[in-house]
């Protein structure tokens, strides 16, 4: 409560431009009393009265941190205030089922900078600061805008696609700018990537996370993103803002100030989703000749488990971007339900899977990625298991 009170008090101080003298005391984030005087000795129009910057944290190793994180840092040296305004969800570590159900909420938090950096230092993730070159009136308005969102609390459903950390920063700054515009470089409009393209490009260090993310993300993330709508990834936001201008001046500093040194990234190693998919495909081909039922049952169990999860996401979950997913064709619980009568439907279903694999591969080669290659190979392995159940193989 003290933190929120301090921030709201500072907002009031920023908005009041008095010519009278009033003695006051406020408390900074270190808990120290700071004597202030409302008089002409405090120049609220000075450019350094409020210092605004963009903070970007290195990617983590789990689903919710694999793309990194971005937040805004606002400082008022005169009054000893220094906060990170970070748009975050409720803790997901022990609430995975709530996450899959779409029950987690999001909100804007005001966190003292030292506390914010300590979290990333503990995780071995670097934090980099880029100064925002904004007019003082915009920086004061930005602080007011952020305070309002902090006061709203954690009230919005978790939505990584429409309310991710990077894209909300864009919205906050645009709101503070008012009629002023961010002039982006023409290169931002030369390409229209999809959300899936952006995730694939920025998760080469975490292939298993990308593999799982493709199961969670439906067709909504496959729509082309135009202009600043594609600034979903923190590092992409940095690159775009380093080339952008406001009032003819560069928006972002070109070189960062390192607040936390990051540790070297560790890749997934040799056992990747692609290796697993190739292994399953080889075993499926070999089992056409071996005729062992154990592999078929193992594949059916895995397909059913994934299929139940996929069906839940599409039909029952409120998680964003799960309304439809092309992976529902190969992954659903229907094969298990009708397994006893498989010789009657196995051949046409194998044909459906073959068409699906061909279509997904063609789309990927064409450049419109809907699934990963590892998913396609895995479905091919499942196709061979289904084909083995046809009258051609069943005696």
Predicted regions and their residues:
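Glycine-rich catalytic cores of cysteine/serine-nucleophile enzymes that process amide/ester linkages
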Residues: 47-124
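Activation targets extended, charge/polar-rich intrinsically disordered C-terminal tails
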Residues: 26, 148-337, 344-395
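Short, charged, amphipathic alpha-helices and their helix-cap/turn boundaries
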Residues: 137-148
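Second-shell loop/turn segments in exported
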Residues: 60-61, 125-133, 151-160
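Cleaved targeting-peptide boundary
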Residues: 25-36
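Bacterial N-terminal signal peptides
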Residues: 8-18
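Positively charged n-region of N-terminal signal peptides that target proteins for export
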Residues: 1-7, 395
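Sec/Tat signal peptide C-region and signal peptidase I cleavage site
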Residues: 20-24
């Amino acid at each position: 409560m003290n933190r929120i009170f301090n921030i709201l008090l500072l907002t009031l101080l920023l908005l009041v431009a008095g010519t009278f003298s009033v003695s006051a005391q406020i408390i900074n984030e270190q808990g120290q009393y700071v004597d202030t005087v409302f008089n002409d000795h405090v120049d609220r129009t000075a450019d350094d009265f409020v210092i605004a910057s963009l903070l970007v944290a290195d990617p983590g190793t789990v689903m919710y941190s694999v793309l990194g994180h971005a937040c805004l840092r606002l400082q008022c040296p005169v009054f000893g205030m220094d906060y990170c305004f970070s748009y975050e969800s409720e803790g997901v570590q022990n609430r995975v089922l709530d996450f899959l159900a779409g029950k987690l909420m999001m909100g804007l938090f005001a966190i003292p900078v030292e506390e914010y950096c300590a979290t990333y230092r503990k995780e071995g993730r670097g934090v980099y600061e880029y100064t925002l070159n904004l007019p003082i009136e915009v920086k004061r308005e930005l602080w007011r805008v952020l305070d309002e969102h902090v006061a709203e609390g954690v009230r919005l459903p978790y939505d990584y696609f429409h309310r991710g950390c990077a894209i909300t920063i864009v919205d906050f700054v645009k709101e503070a700018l008012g009629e002023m515009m961010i002039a982006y470089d023409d290169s931002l409009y030369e390409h229209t990537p999809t959300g899936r393209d952006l995730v694939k490009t920025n998760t080469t260090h975490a292939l298993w996370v990308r593999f799982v993310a493709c199961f969670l993300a439906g067709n909504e993330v496959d729509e082309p993103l135009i202009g600043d709508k594609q600034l979903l990834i923190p590092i992409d936001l940095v690159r775009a803002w380093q080339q952008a201008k406001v009032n003819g001046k560069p928006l972002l500093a070109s070189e960062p100030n390192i607040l936390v040194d990051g540790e070297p990234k560790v890749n997934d190693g040799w056992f990747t989703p692609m290796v697993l998919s190739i292994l399953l495909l080889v075993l499926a081909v070999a089992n056409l000749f071996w005729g062992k039922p154990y592999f078929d049952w193992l594949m059916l169990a895995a397909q059913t488990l994934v299929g139940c999860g996929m069906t839940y996401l599409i039909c029952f979950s409120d998680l964003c971007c799960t309304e439809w997913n092309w992976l529902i064709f190969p992954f659903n619980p229907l094969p298990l339900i009708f397994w006893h009568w498989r010789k009657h439907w196995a051949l046409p279903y194998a044909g459906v899977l073959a068409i699906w694999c061909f279509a997904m591969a063609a789309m990927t080669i064409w450049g419109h990625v809907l699934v990963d290659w590892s998913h396609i190979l895995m479905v091919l392995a499942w196709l061979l298991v289904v084909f083995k159940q046809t009258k051609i193989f069943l005696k």
